[in-house]
């Protein structure tokens, strides 16, 4: 046959192999999706499960591929109604099967052409040609097997064709051939064994060329270890030498792919197993390595059973069947342990490789081959484990459960990251290699060729010229390289020189083939690093093994030593989109969503695990910190005092209590505490969370650290509220000082997280603690501000109103009074200076402002009630206001007054609330003076230098600022706001003002009644009265200031009027002779002094003019004398 008849360039073998292989993967993707859709009741075409069409579908399948529409009108009647919808909805399925048929036709044509051309195949010489030929054979075989696994194929094709027949009056033109193909390939491998008889020579030649490559790749871990495979440091003297091989692309060729070539290849040309020992050896070695092969994604092929079923009907194949059974036994017994040991070796090898390259990234140049070999080896082992995990024999289950798989995946990801990061380093190296070495060697080889036709010579020369023109400056300038044309030309050249009649035969010039294969690898190191990473380390198959994927992740988190590698699982989600194909765009969204949901789940679980560890550490630290609280030293002090006084207490031999801090004393470094374990586990997990700042998954960016930050915020919020230990039923709550200690411990632990992860923990504190200063947090949950505000108002101050607690000015605290029913809490432990300061630290200015507003709301409700009482007595009070100098008339009018005790009680309650508020404000001022002294001093200057002529609105703004900083003000802005909201629309401002004036009158004339109360006795020790009437001083001054600010009256004048009325009323009880009514007269006199002392508007001179100072002096003398007498 002349060269012109079958000219290689005209056959376009390279182009056809490239296109058909790509199209084959696309067809596999489409068939796979059809199979999965038909297997899912939710996604299955509705016509296949429609009860009305059930009989029609059964009829069509039974008669398939024949078409009979005339005599079966009853069975096909329903089909007639839905024919248009069937045509529309099943078209995609039907034409996918048509495309498969056309693909089959093209493949058969190409295989025949290759046979006619008598193409020479050798994986070590014409690598691209041989690999693509074997890939096409396997893709074609896989496609036909997958087609035969779609059980509904006949129903789909038949339904569509019947609908077409009913609509157009004739079958679809592709139907006869398609129907016959479906029938012919009912048992695909059996049919293909017949079909491949003429192709046996070409296929067996290609497969036998693997005899040097496959056995060398399929070695045990011990052999790898002895050869020090993938080690850069085993021979330091050669560390900088480039990693070279005569078969460069074969070194990282997938073992999984080679096993598929060998298994399927020798099934199709099984005659070679009887005549060729090399073929039999390859076949047996492959059979011993696996129990199943991956057809496509998660579709597997059980090789031993299938091969045995095919060979059992062939005469003279008993020996081959025995071989299969022996190999199956070997695979079941030894394959699991062999692959387990390989994974173990690869973990250490990849770790060493990644560590060395991270320290010396320049070695990525000469040792790039090692990186891609390592990635390919590891990927093969992971995929092997994945497909065998669900198909494992029970007796060796442990070999198929690898709890350390995360470590292997992690080091793969680390190597991938090195390649991406240091791509320019590799580019510089290989650009120089190509121009300075490869171009020279190739030029010499071309020059020494005895025969070189014109076409081949032109291609060779273009190779040399392309490489010679390269320079490092192109890399430095960021130029984009593209050697795809050069690689395709080499593929074409392989096709031209591998046919039997070629002038330049590649079989006779093997050195040229090996050199060009090496050059092609070098070009890929310059322009196709990302594609190389996909080729050697793509693990998108995990997308289709979701359950196994999640199980591996959970095992990784459960094992503390492996949790540092858990980031490998979210990183794998970035691979998923590489398994999509342009021939099946509809699955992109589904796979993208799966990658996003899995990545989100993994990162969320990692953050939760870290959060739980942090919470446990915080709990431990809070427990240790709690041991240092002052309350726990009482027993130690007691023991010391008893020891000093030589008192024998307790039983002999009582064990001495461990002192706080004893846990830090280590006698043996091997002793590991629970806290040590928690810190170790946390550091491991945080390494993983901190490993990458962010990752891109299907056009979304994930930031692992933000997951942790978010979880820490939520947990910190819950913990703070939880640590208050608020019990609504028993009204118990933690002391502010103890909560503050716990919160500070919590914050200390959280701050230490910054040593592990680069997160802004200050942001967490700001977000959480600022929310805790509000009534509700961002989730609508109660905060410590609302809990403590509620407790102080509803529990502590309510008990004060009930007479169980008194405010002691001398101690600046509320103290329990001895009563029949003991309270469940000690008021002093919640209201002394240190507790109020702790409360201010926790709630901050915002929280304390909310507390103040809540207090003022209670005061305003009391004032509203007082106004009602004033309105009831308005006529009497109006007369009393002008008759204070007429004793007899005042006495008569006073008897007409109602609710005198109620007025005093309500004013006392107001005074108690204001006293509590003054404690809170003082504590807030102390806290802010410590934290922001300069700002507080500036606010003080503002407040202290308000000119008297200043507009009241401006003054109130300054007072509001001062009050927020905890500074005392002449007029309380919060009280003014609270009382302003009480203005009634039905009452005129003049009437409101009159009621306010009369309220002060009512209080003034009611004071003498306090003298008859037993509890009104003044106690010098507490500087107050046990019934809290000393709080009236604060109530009178603050209420007067607020009311007359609102009504724009003179505060000073009204207080003078009050002082005149009060002193006149009190002087009258000095003349009383009834001991009951004057029981505590002196103690009540002191109220006048307290009112003046408390007021910024009244002076002692003014008091002297109304009430003789001698009376006050005598009163003080009397109460102090009485106090000494009663204490004695």
UniProtKB/Swiss-Prot annotation:
Region annotation (Disordered) ranges: 640-665
Transmembrane segments: 995-1015
Family of the protein in this entry: Belongs to the HEM-1/HEM-2 family.
Membrane topology: Single-pass membrane protein
The protein's name: Nck-associated protein 1
Any one GO cellular component localisation term in the record: filamentous actin
Keyword Transport (UniProt): no
Quaternary structure and interacting proteins, as annotated: Component of the WAVE1 complex composed of ABI2, CYFIP1 or CYFIP2, BRK1, NCKAP1 and WASF1/WAVE1. Within the complex, a heterodimer containing NCKAP1 and CYFIP1 interacts with a heterotrimer formed by WAVE1, ABI2 and BRK1. Component of the WAVE2 complex composed of ABI1, CYFIP1/SRA1, NCKAP1/NAP1 and WASF2/WAVE2. CYFIP2 binds to activated RAC1 which causes the complex to dissociate, releasing activated WASF1. The complex can also be activated by NCK1. Associates preferentially with the first SH3 domain of NCK. Interacts with NYAP1, NYAP2 and MYO16. Interacts with TMEM132D.
Gene: Nckap1
Bias type Basic and acidic residues, positions: 651-665
Protein's GO biological process: apical protein localization; basal protein localization; cell migration; cell migration involved in gastrulation; cell morphogenesis; cell projection assembly; cortical actin cytoskeleton organization; embryonic body morphogenesis
Subcellular locations according to the entry: Cell membrane; Cell projection, Lamellipodium membrane
């Amino acid at each position: 046959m002349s060269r012109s008849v079958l000219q290689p360039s005209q056959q376009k073998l390279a182009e056809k192999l490239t296109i058909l292989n790509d199209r084959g993967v696309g067809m596999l993707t489409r068939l796979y999706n059809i199979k999965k859709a038909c297997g899912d009741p939710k996604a299955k075409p509705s016509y296949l499960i429609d009860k009305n069409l059930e009989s029609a579908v059964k009829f069509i399948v039974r008669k398939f591929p024949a078409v009979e529409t005339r005599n079966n009108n009853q069975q096909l009647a329903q089909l007639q109604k839905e024919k248009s919808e069937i045509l529309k909805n099943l078209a995609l399925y039907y034409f996918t099967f048509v495309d498969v048929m056309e693909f089959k036709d093209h493949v058969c044509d190409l295989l025949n052409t290759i046979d006619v051309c008598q193409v020479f195949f050798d994986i070590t010489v014409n690598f691209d040609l041989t690999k693509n030929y074997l890939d096409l054979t396997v893709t074609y075989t896989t496609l036909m097997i997958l087609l035969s696994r779609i059980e509904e194929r006949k129903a789909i094709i038949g339904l569509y064709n019947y609908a077409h027949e009913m609509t157009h009056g004739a079958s679809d033109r592709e139907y006869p051939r398609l129907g016959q193909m479906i029938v012919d390939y009912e048992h695909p491998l059996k049919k293909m064994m017949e079909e491949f008889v003429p192709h046996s020579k070409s296929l067996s030649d290609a497969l036998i060329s693997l005899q040097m490559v496959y056995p060398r790749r399929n070695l045990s871990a011990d052999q790898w270890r002895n050869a020090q495979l993938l080690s850069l440091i085993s021979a330091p003297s050669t560390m900088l030498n480039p990693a070279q091989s005569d078969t460069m692309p074969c070194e990282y060729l997938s073992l999984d792919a080679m096993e598929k070539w060998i298994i399927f290849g020798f099934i199709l040309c099984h005659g070679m197993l009887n005549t060729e020992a090399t073929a039999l050896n390859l076949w047996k070695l492959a059979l011993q390595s696996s129990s199943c092969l991956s057809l496509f994604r998660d579709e597997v092929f059980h090789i031993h059973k299938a091969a045995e079923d095919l060979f059992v009907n062939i005469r003279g194949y008993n020996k081959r069947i025995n071989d299969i059974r022996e190999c199956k036994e070997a695979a079941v017994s030894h394959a699991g342990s062999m692959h387990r040991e390989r994974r173990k070796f690869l973990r250490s090898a990849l770790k060493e490789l990644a560590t060395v390259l991270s320290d010396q990234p320049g070695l990525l140049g000469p040792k790039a081959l090692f990186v891609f070999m390592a990635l390919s080896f590891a990927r093969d082992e992971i995929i092997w484990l994945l497909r065998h995990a669900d198909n494992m024999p029970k007796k060796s289950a442990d070999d198929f459960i690898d709890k350390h798989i995360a470590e292997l995946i992690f080091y793969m990801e680390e190597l991938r990251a090195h390649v991406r990061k240091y791509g320019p380093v590799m580019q510089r190296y290989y650009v120089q290699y190509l121009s300075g070495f490869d171009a020279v060697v190739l030029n010499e080889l071309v020059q020494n060729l005895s025969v070189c036709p014109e076409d081949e010579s032109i291609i060779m020369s273009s190779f040399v010229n392309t490489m010679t023109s390269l320079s490092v400056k192109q890399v430095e300038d960021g130029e984009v390289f593209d050697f795809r044309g050069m690689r395709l030309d080499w593929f074409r050249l392989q096709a031209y020189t591998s046919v039997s009649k070629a002038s330049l035969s590649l079989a006779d010039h093997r050195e040229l083939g090996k050199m060009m294969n090496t050059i092609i690898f070098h070009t890929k190191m310059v322009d196709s690093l990302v594609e190389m990473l996909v080729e050697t380390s793509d693990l998108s198959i995990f997308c289709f093994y979701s359950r196994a994927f999640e199980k591996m992740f959970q095992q990784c988190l459960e094992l503390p030593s492996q949790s540092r590698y858990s980031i490998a699982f979210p990183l794998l989600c970035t691979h998923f989109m590489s398994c999509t194909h342009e021939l099946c765009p509809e699955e992109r969204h589904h796979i993208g969503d799966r990658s996003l949901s899995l990545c989100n789940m993994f990162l969320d679980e990692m953050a939760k695990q870290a959060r739980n560890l942090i919470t446990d550490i915080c709990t431990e630290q809070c427990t240790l910190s709690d041991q240092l609280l002052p309350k726990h030293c009482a027993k130690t002090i007691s023991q010391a005092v008893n020891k000093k006084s030589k008192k024998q207490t307790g039983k002999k031999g009582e064990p001495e209590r461990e002192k706080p801090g004893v846990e830090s004393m280590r006698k043996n470094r091997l002793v590991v505490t629970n806290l040590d374990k928690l810190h170790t586990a946390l550091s491991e997990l945080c390494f993983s969370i901190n490993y990458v700042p962010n990752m891109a998954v299907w056009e979304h960016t994930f930031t692992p650290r933000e997951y942790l930050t978010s979880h820490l915020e939520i947990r910190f919020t819950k913990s703070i509220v939880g640590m208050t230990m608020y019990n609504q039923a028993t009204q118990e709550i933690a002391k502010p000082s103890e909560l503050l200690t716990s919160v500070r411990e919590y914050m200390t632990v959280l701050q230490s997280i910054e040593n592990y992860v680069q997160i802004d923990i200050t942001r967490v504190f700001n977000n959480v603690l600022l929310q805790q200063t509000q009534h509700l947090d961002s989730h609508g949950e109660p905060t410590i501000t609302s809990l403590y505000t509620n407790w102080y108002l509803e529990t502590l101050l309510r008990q004060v109103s009930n007479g169980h607690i008194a405010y002691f000015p001398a101690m600046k605290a509320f103290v329990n009074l001895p009563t029949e029913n003991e309270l469940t809490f000690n008021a002093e432990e919640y209201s002394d200076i240190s507790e109020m300061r702790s409360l201010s630290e926790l709630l901050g200015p915002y929280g304390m402002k909310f507390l103040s507003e809540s207090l003022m709301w209670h005061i305003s409700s009391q004032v509203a009630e007082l106004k009602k009482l004033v309105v009831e007595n308005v006529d009497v009070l109006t007369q009393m206001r002008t008759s204070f100098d007429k004793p007899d008339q005042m006495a008569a009018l006073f008897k007409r007054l109602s609710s005198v005790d109620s007025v005093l009680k309500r004013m006392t309650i107001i005074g108690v609330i204001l006293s509590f508020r003054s404690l809170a404000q003082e504590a807030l001022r102390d806290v802010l003076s410590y934290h922001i002294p300069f700002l507080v001093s500036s606010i003080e200057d503002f407040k202290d230098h308000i000119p008297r002529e200043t507009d009241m609105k401006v003054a109130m703004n300054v007072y509001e600022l001062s009050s927020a900083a905890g500074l005392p003000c002449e007029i309380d802005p919060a009280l003014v706001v609270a009382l302003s909201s009480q203005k009634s629309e039905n009452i005129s401002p003049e009437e409101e003002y009159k009621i306010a004036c009369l309220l002060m009158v009512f209080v003034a004339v009611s004071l003498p009644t306090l003298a008859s109360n037993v509890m009104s006795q003044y106690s010098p020790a507490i500087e107050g009265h046990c019934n809290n009437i000393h709080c009236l001083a604060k109530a009178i001054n603050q209420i007067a200031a607020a009311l007359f600010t609102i009504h724009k009256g003179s505060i000073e004048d009204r207080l003078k009027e009050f002082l005149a009325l009060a002193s006149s009323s009190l002087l009258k009880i000095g003349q009383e002779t009834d001991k009951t009514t004057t029981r505590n007269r002196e103690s009540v006199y002191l109220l006048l002094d307290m009112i003046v002392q408390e007021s910024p508007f009244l002076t002692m001179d003014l008091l002297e003019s109304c009430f003789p100072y001698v009376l006050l002096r005598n009163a003080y003398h009397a109460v102090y004398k009485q106090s000494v007498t009663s204490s004695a």
